[in-house]
From Swiss-Prot:
The gene is BZIP06. PANTHER family: BASIC LEUCINE ZIPPER 34, BASIC LEUCINE ZIPPER 6. GO terms for cellular component: nucleus. This is Basic leucine zipper 6. GO terms for molecular function: DNA binding; DNA-binding transcription factor activity. Residues 137-189 form the bZIP domain. Disulfide bonds: none annotated. InterPro entries: bZIP, bZIP_RF2, bZIP_sf, bZIP_transcription_regulators. Gene3D superfamilies: 1.20.5.170. Residues 122-132 have a biased composition (Polar residues).
């Protein structure tokens, strides 16, 4: 909160008359210019109360006079201050004296601060009133409780599912540790059987080739046997024909049919 200006001292009437006679027209012109400058500054830019008070206190000291503001009336004095003080106490501009105006400003500022504090509740008050508002709305309370229960059930289901997965993983790991040696042994046996199978395949291929050779040799032998059989039959035929001719030569001429066969042969 901005600081309020101090009360402006009020000089005695005799001192006022002495300043008016001693100051002359120069001091009066300076006071009028200062009042106009304060009014123009008031319309152009807002100043805080502390800045205005500081300016008012420094200006007379620079001029070398102690009671120059006694000549100014209440309206000119109030025009030097920004609207902050005036807005807080609108009736202070029409006060009868400087002391009364300052007191009205102070009271108005305190009442403004009290209204501001009462109009804007603090965080503690908001936190204190929030449970009451929640209790006044039973549907909202039920909805919040239902959401919390649903979230709790969901968390319980997730934890159960995770525990089941962990148990399954542990069981599978135990089975893997038990079956790993057996799998390694079977893998080694498979390698050995693969090598034996390759040897057997090579032997089967060699036997198939040998069978082909043997089949060809057997076919050649069969043809040779057939040829020898034919030769044997021819020799038997010739031998039988020669014996018959010898028998006919001994006992007489051969019969005419046999003689023709011998001629054709």
């Amino acid at each position: 909160m901005a600081q309020l200006p101090p009360k402006i001292p009020v000089a005695a009437p005799g001192h006022h008359q002495h300043w008016a006679s001693a100051g002359g027209a120069g001091d009066a012109a300076w006071a009028d210019e200062f009042a106009e400058f304060a009014a123009s500054r008031r319309g152009a830019h807002r100043r805080s109360l502390s800045d205005s008070v500081a300016f008012v206190e420094v200006a007379p000291a620079g001029c070398g006079a102690g009671g120059e503001f006694d000549r100014l009336d209440d309206d000119q004095l109030m025009s030097m201050f920004p609207d902050e003080g005036g807005s807080s106490a609108p009736g202070s501009d029409n006060g009868g004296s400087d002391s009364d105006g300052g007191g009205d400003k102070h009271a108005a500022a305190q009442s403004d601060d009290g209204q501001h504090a009462a109009g804007e509740p603090t965080q503690e008050q908001a936190a204190a009133t929030s449970p009451t508002e929640l209790i006044r709305d039973p549907k909202r309370v039920k909805r919040i409780l239902a959401n919390r229960q649903s979230a709790q059930r969901s968390r319980v289901r997730k934890l159960q599912y995770i525990s089941e997965l962990e148990r399954s993983v542990t069981t599978l790991q135990n089975e893997v540790s038990v079956l790993s040696p057996r799998v390694a042994f079977l893998d080694q046996q498979r390698t050995i059987l693969t090598v034996g199978n390759s040897h057997l395949k090579q032997r089967i291929a060699a036997l198939a080739q040998d069978k082909i050779f043997k089949d060809a040799h057997q076919e050649a032998l069969r043809k040779e046997i057939e040829r020898l059989r034919q030769v044997y039959q021819q020799q038997n035929t010739k031998l039988s024909g020669g014996l018959a001719a010898d028998h006919a030569h001994v006992h007489g001429g051969p019969p005419p049919v046999r003689a023709e066969k011998e001629l054709m042969s």
